[in-house]
Amino acid sequence: MEAIAKYDFKATADDELSFKRGDILKVLNEECDQNWYKAELNGKDGFIPKNYIEMKPHPWFFGKIPRAKAEEMLSKQRHDGAFLIRESESAPGDFSLSVKFGNDVQHFKVLRDGAGKYFLWVVKFNSLNELVDYHRSTSVSRNQQIFLRDIEQMPQQPTYVQALFDFDPQEDGELGFRRGDFIHVMDNSDPNWWKGACHGQTGMFPRNYVTPVNRNV
């Protein structure tokens, strides 16, 4: 996940990471502390204050969604190449790419080299975003021609919804919120569970806990 720095930050401890306003940071772990994230910049990693950055949620990043839930969601998509990136269940801190092809969903481990670059095969990238963009026109598979395509959205649905009730996550990959919170809907292709962003976090939430709002927030 990527974030953009809103302010300059000067590290005051050995395990903190300095950055300048406008820097793009790779957020490695959002769960270390309520107020601090672990992030990487220019090959160095350390802790950064949460309130100094703005997350850049991508519609294809689903966080800690379980592999089975990813397969269920992608199997409902109509076109080959529909994909999402999730945090690996078997290797915490790593990422997996799940892609629909035919009647199956294929999973690819996103690898990283010693310099922190991401890759699937040979070509390496500075960010997951660059990897995704490259594989929109270059197959992710060596056995079939599979080009990444965004999950189909339903544009008639609202961009924002408001929480009717408190929701506390029961599983990894779910999005917690309080009654009255506004949630940015990032994917509503599943009738029961939608993906959204709230308070800088992204995750899945139950559709029946929210109501549409007729304005942007």
From Swiss-Prot:
Annotated localization: Nucleus; Cytoplasm; Endosome; Golgi apparatus
Top-level taxon of origin: Eukaryota
Residues that bear Phosphothreonine: T211
Keywords: Acetylation, Cytoplasm, Endosome, Golgi apparatus, Isopeptide bond, Nucleus, Phosphoprotein, Repeat, SH2 domain, SH3 domain, Ubl conjugation
A GO molecular function held by the record: molecular adaptor activity
SUPFAM superfamilies listed in its UniProt record: SH2 domain, SH3-domain
Start and end residues of each SH2 domain: 60-152
Domain SH3: 1-58, 156-215
Record-linked InterPro entries: Grb2-like (IPR043539), GRB2_C_SH3 (IPR035643), GRB2_N_SH3 (IPR035641), SH2 (IPR000980), SH2_dom_sf (IPR036860), SH3-like_dom_sf (IPR036028), SH3_domain (IPR001452)
One of the record's GO cellular component terms: cytosol
Tissue: Expressed in macrophages.
Subunit structure: Associates (via SH2 domain) with activated EGF and PDGF receptors (tyrosine phosphorylated). Interacts with PDGFRA (tyrosine phosphorylated); the interaction may be indirect. Interacts with IRS4 (when Tyr-phosphorylated). Also associates to other cellular Tyr-phosphorylated proteins such as SIT1, IRS1, IRS2, SHC and LNK; probably via the concerted action of both its SH2 and SH3 domains. It also seems to interact with RAS in the signaling pathway leading to DNA synthesis. Interacts with SOS1.
This protein's name: Growth factor receptor-bound protein 2
Gene for this chain: Grb2
